From Swiss-Prot:
Record's function text: Has antibacterial activity against the Gram-positive bacteria L.lactis (MIC=25 uM) and S.uberis (MIC=50 uM). Lacks antibacterial activity against the Gram-negative bacteria E.cloacae and E.coli, and against the Gram-positive bacteria B.cereus, E.faecalis, L.innocua, M.luteus, S.aureus and S.epidermidis. Inhibits the formation of NO by neuronal nitric oxide synthase with an IC(50) of 2.4 uM.
Protein name, as recorded: Deserticolin-1
Keyword Secreted: yes
UniProt KW Repeat keyword: no
Keywords, sorted A to Z: Amidation, Amphibian defense peptide, Antibiotic, Antimicrobial, Secreted
GO cellular component: extracellular region
Example GO biological process: defense response to bacterium
Biological source species: Crinia deserticola (Desert froglet)
Principal subcellular localisation of the protein: secreted
Tissue expression summary: Expressed by the skin glands.
Taxonomy, superkingdom: Eukaryota
Serine amide found at: 19
Localization in the cell: Secreted
């Protein structure tokens, strides 16, 4: 659902920022 999409998007952003 939308929540899953947002969760994945946030996870990608967090990984990008942490790297």
């Amino acid at each position: 659902g939308l929540a899953d999409f947002l969760n994945k998007a946030v996870g990608k952003v967090v990984d990008f920022v942490k790297s």
